[in-house]
Amino acid sequence: MRLLLTNDDGIMAEGIQVLAKHFEKDNEVIIAAPDVQRSGSGHCITTVPGELIIQEVKLEGINSKAYSITGTPADCARLGVRKLGNNQIDMVISGINNGFNLGIDSLYSGTVSAAIEAAICETPSIAVSLDTKGGNYDYNIAAEYALEVFSIYKDKYKNKDENVVLSLNVPCLPREKIKGLKVCRVGFKYHLQEIYDKGEKTEELSYNYTDIYYVKRGYAALSPLHYDLTNYKILGDINNLFTEK
């Protein structure tokens, strides 16, 4: 397959380079990433003409073509798909992010936003994030999980009408201690560290069986996302409210 790799940590980040080494073995890979660290940039895009500069760079130990872009992660995803990939990218993989993107933090994440931008460009995508706060982390473990998700997803998901974004979060544990992969919804709790610090029982919080819930228990978490922001639950009520005579 023809893949685009991007991130928000920048073209020189370890995560994207480890990801490239794993994926370029059996796929055609193009790398397009910000020239500098862009974490927390959300879905920001560049609107001023001429401010985006694309420069080809050589990454040590990587055979794939790589491009440094003076823009945001969302810029990189769009330029990668539309311009560098000539609208012939089969899938975009964003990451590996230095740190989790769990719960509401996904809204602030440049890594997740790049994946969503790919879906807006009608290209399925996977955002990959790794817990690095434990200190003894290994990007190779996250890359292996990403490759596993990619392999299953590309072969078995046939609904081409759905521009799906998958968000994968991998805990900071040795490979043999990760309990497995859980497909789950995204939680709403703000910042995982708050939960750790408070020491509250998870059964008492609203994130049961969410991405936060599972990674705290040693699982990798996989959540399907979409960019339709409509609140369908109250859409009819609001319509009735404003059409009453």
Curated annotation (Swiss-Prot):
SUPFAM superfamilies: SurE-like. A divalent metal cation binds at residues 8-9, 39, 97. GO terms for cellular component: cytoplasm. GO terms for molecular function: 3'-nucleotidase activity; 5'-nucleotidase activity; exopolyphosphatase activity; metal ion binding; nucleotide binding. Pfam families: SurE. The keyword Hydrolase applies. Keywords: Cytoplasm, Hydrolase, Metal-binding, Nucleotide-binding. It comes from the Bacteria. Binds 1 divalent metal cation per subunit. Its cofactor is a divalent metal cation. Its EC number is 3.1.3.5. It catalyses: a ribonucleoside 5'-phosphate + H2O = a ribonucleoside + phosphate. The keyword Disulfide bond does not apply. InterPro entries: SurE (IPR030048), SurE-like_Pase/nucleotidase (IPR002828), SurE-like_sf (IPR036523). It is found in: Cytoplasm. It is an enzyme of class 3 (hydrolase). NCBIfam families: PRK13933.1 (NF010543), surE (TIGR00087). HAMAP family: SurE (MF_00060). Belongs to the SurE nucleotidase family. Nucleotidase that shows phosphatase activity on nucleoside 5'-monophosphates. This is 5'-nucleotidase SurE. It comes from Clostridium kluyveri (strain ATCC 8527 / DSM 555 / NBRC 12016 / NCIMB 10680 / K1).
